[in-house]
Amino acid sequence: MALDSMREIFDRMAEEGKPFWEIVLETDMEERQVTRNQSMAKMLTMWQAMSDAADGYTGRRRSVSGLVGGDGMKMRQYNLRGEAMTGGYVSEVIAEALSMAESNACMGRIVAAPTAGACGVLPAVLLPLCKYEELSQHQLLEALYVASGIGAVIAYRACIAGASGGCQAEIGTASAMAAGALVALRGGDGQQIGHAVAMALKNLMGLVCDPVAGLVEVPCVKRNVIGAVNAVSVADMAMAGITSQVPVDEVIDAMGEVGRRMPVEFRETALGGLAATPTGVAIQEKMRKSS
């Protein structure tokens, strides 16, 4: 998607008098040479896949390694008992993030947003919101366009893969996408979307990618939670009028620079961080012997 800066989107919004989501929609139409209806039908497929993944989660499946599985259901049950300190919407965001990320680890069908490893963040903030607010299908699709536009800019200016820029590039980008989508759903303007994106990325800048045994399981599943909760927090801050002192495009560029300078041990190689702990090494050795 040919969007190379958030500033470009903001300028087009001002010049054309169109909302953020529509600028992204029209860019998709131009890039893929599709009609408006075709573009929206494709986005609806993405939303339905997210919803189906959530509905299909039972908590009974475990990953092949046995490292993850069932935590999403534990959180759901904890919420139902009324014991969650966060309560309400945020506690459901946590449960959904765990459930979706576990589904990926257990070979379920998910939507990479922007990657499979970060697939739990965006649906985690959107799906529970449908229970608390009356959101039309069109509003949800608009939010997904906002998220995809943000992801496209970050992919162009920085990176979205853990192997390229660490977990900040995956979970950080997913969190920024989710934050922008939430602000759009709450009626925020382009500048508020930009501030939410900037704050989301700043909060997770420098986060390394250190998967135990090289699997997208530990700590990846639980990091989807922090990405989702971070998105909710910064969306609220942006809607409250709190701003990022560093412009969003500069924040994106900084994240890219941090990623490029990050040692290879912290970019999905399983050579550093949690993967290099005694327990991490032991798990990897156990899996090697059993394969």
Question: What are the roles of these predicted feature ranges?
Answer:
Residues 1-108, 131-132, 241, 248-291:
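Generic N-terminal targeting/processing segments that precede catalytic cores or assembly contacts
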Residues 87-104, 139-158, 203-211:
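Acidic-glycine-rich active-site phosphate/pyrophosphate-binding loop
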Residues 107-125, 169-174:
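Conserved phosphate/anionic-ligand binding catalytic regions in large, soluble enzymes, centered on
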Residues 184-291:
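Functionally critical mobile loop/hinge segments
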Residues 123-134, 179-187:
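Alpha-helical support elements that line or immediately flank enzyme active sites
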Residues 155, 160-168, 174-175, 179, ...:
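N-terminal glycine-/lysine-enriched basic segments
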Residues 107-110, 160-166, 218:
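Active-site-adjacent structural elements in folded domains
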Residues 85, 112-119, 131, 136, ...:
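Glycine- and small hydrophobic-enriched segments that form the cores of compact globular domains
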